[in-house]
Regions:
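Glycine-rich, Lys/Arg-enriched anion-binding loops that position phosphate/diphosphate groups
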Residues: 170, 181-282
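Anionic-ligand anchoring segments at beta-strand to alpha-helix junctions in alpha/beta enzyme folds, i.e.
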Residues: 27-93
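Hydrophobic/aromatic beta-strand patches that form the interior of the parallel beta-sheet core
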Residues: 62, 99, 121-125, 137-140, ...
Length: 369
């Protein structure tokens, strides 16, 4: 528990969290982050792990999928953040509760695993729109650029007192700084609260470690997907639309980076990149939406284009103008040979483009790119 003087200065969510953690003193918790976690979720989970130690709570961080962004891989390795990738041999029976960070249950397969193991959810802390999907003891769902902002606020309020002489605290501050940097697209979309958080963290973070994380280059796979997006893109009324075929589920981050890249092209205000993600026999059409147009609402655009009941739209961070989306592939899912897969992709590619063209209000004839 935080010291009495610090507790007396607390109010709001940090005081409520202090009370909840105090009531679970001595327990073992599983921290759950999204299946394909980004630096924001990783940094926040790492910070929660350190805060938990103040209450004699041991906590392990779990994810289901894969970390494939070069910066995120370096973040984990350089800062010695221990993450456990789920496998069927893992046994959750020794855990007293679960903590969901950077997800409210819809972006992690582990929610069902924990439910089957009768592990009760204790906390949900996230910066996305409230989904009311998990029934937990404590919620802190804020409209913020990142979950790292929320955890920085906890640190400022005294849930963990950072010390410059503590190497682990230095790594924690560095991780949170990068989480904020990533979610604000290197501060392009940063607001006052982001700069205030960074100003606080800069007193403890290691700038040389941060520089090494930031300067990681794109992987060959990401470059291949960007090249495919450039080759297949269709530009209509300042919208750049590209389908990049089939990808493994763990390579989904390449879709986001390709959309970021297309948005840098001259006279393009909106980029939409999509692919069919394969994970065994399960397939889903996954896409990324980026726009610089202030009057364009990403949620409304996508739901009106594809149908409100047909698509899941989620906030990817970086700005209010960035979204990810998924459309399930049901009985057509699964591989059926090269010819079958080629035909299936053509059908989905044509259908997605047609719906987007209809929403934009243009014909489907290809423009010169």
């Amino acid at each position: 528990m935080a010291s009495r003087s610090i507790v007396n200065s607390m109010n709001g969510k940090e005081l409520e969290l202090d009370k909840v953690l105090s009531s679970h003193r001595g327990e073992k918790h599983g921290i759950i982050i999204p299946d394909f976690p980004d630096s924001d979720a990783i940094a926040s989970a790492f910070t929660h792990q350190l805060i938990s130690l103040q209450y004699n709570i041991s906590a392990d961080i779990f994810y289901w999928g894969k970390i494939n962004n070069p910066q995120d891989i370096v973040l984990v390795k350089l800062l010695d953040i221990e993450l456990i990738r789920y496998s069927e041999t893992l046994d959750f029976s020794g855990y007293d509760g679960s903590v969901f960070i950077g997800t409210q249950g819809t972006t992690t397969t582990l929610r069902q695993v924990l439910e089957a193991s009768n592990i009760k959810p204790i906390l949900v802390i996230d910066h996305h729109e409230e989904e009311d999907f998990i029934h937990a003891e404590f919620y802190d769902i804020r409209k913020a650029s990142s979950t790292s902002i929320i955890y920085t606020d906890y640190l400022k309020k005294g849930l963990l007192k950072l010390e410059r002489s503590n190497p682990t605290h230095i790594k924690c501050a560095t991780a949170l700084m990068y989480g904020i940097m990533y979610k604000t697209d290197r501060y392009i979309w940063a607001k006052e609260e982001d700069f205030q958080a960074v100003a606080f963290l800069s007193n403890y973070a290691d700038s040389s470690l941060l520089e090494e994380i930031v300067n990681q280059s794109r992987s060959k796979k990401v470059m291949d997907v960007i090249q495919k997006a450039l080759e297949s893109r269709v530009i209509k009324q300042n919208y750049s639309i590209a389908g990049v075929g089939y990808l493994r589920a763990e390579d989904r981050n390449a879709i986001h980076q390709a959309a970021d890249f297309l948005l840098t092209e001259e006279n393009v205000h909106t980029a939409i990149v999509y692919a069919i993600l394969q994970n065994g026999n399960r397939e889903v059409l996954s896409g990324s939406f980026r726009t610089r147009k202030l009057t364009l609402d990403p949620d409304e655009f996508l739901r009106e284009a594809f149908g409100r009941g047909e698509i899941e739209v989620y906030y990817e961070g970086k700005s209010q103008k960035v979204r990810g989306f998924e459309i399930p592939i049901f009985f057509l899912a699964g591989t059926g040979g090269e010819e079958y897969n080629t035909l299936k992709w053509r059908v989905y590619d044509m259908q997605v483009k047609q719906k987007l063209f209809n929403k934009i209000g243009v014909s489907e004839e290809r423009e010169e790119t």
